[in-house]
UniProtKB/Swiss-Prot annotation:
Residues 5-47, 76-119 form the SpoVT-AbrB domain. CDD domains: MraZ_C, MraZ_N. SUPFAM superfamilies: AbrB/MazE/MraZ-like. GO terms for molecular function: DNA-binding transcription factor activity; transcription cis-regulatory region binding. This is Transcriptional regulator MraZ.
Length: 143
């Protein structure tokens, strides 16, 4: 399970060091794709493969679903962390997420999100008041 907030820095070669506690879960390979709200989503390879296969199976007769699968496949990069736990983020991914040197990696239960630090702080400030309402509406009192 991916939980927590971490603040790694992007180096001059576009490499980001993944939080140490997640490296074992991602050692078998990972997939970096464009996420929501101009973040990047990082999935374990097996998890992403299962999601992509389900999306592809549903898309054969639906033009919107086919377009989504095309964009998903074209915007995804397979990575394997190096010995220091770093992955190289493509220029396209860095541009999409508007990544500066200071980044934030957050756990989103079954995947990670990579954000530009300033964008993450703005997102939190903008949505802070909505958190309690969203929790109550979407989780119905579980928490």
């Amino acid at each position: 399970m991916f939980l927590g907030t971490y603040t790694p820095r992007l180096d001059d070669k576009g490499r980001l060091t993944l939080p140490a506690k997640f490296r074992d879960d991602l050692a078998g390979g990972l997939m970096v794709t464009k996420g929501q709200d101009h973040s990047l989503a990082v999935y374990p390879k097996e998890e992403f493969t299962a999601l992509a296969r389900r999306a592809a199976a549903a898309s054969r007769s639906n033009p919107q679903a086919r377009a989504f699968v095309r964009a998903l496949a074209a915007g995804t990069d397979e990575q394997r962390p190096d010995a220091q736990g770093r992955i190289t983020l493509s220029a396209d991914h860095r541009r999409y997420a508007n990544l500066s040197r200071d980044c934030v990696v957050i756990g989103s239960v079954d995947f990670l999100e990579i954000w530009d630090k300033q964008a993450w702080e703005s997102y939190l400030a903008e949505h802070e008041e909505d958190y309690a309402q969203a929790r109550d509406e979407s989780l119905g009192g579980i928490f």
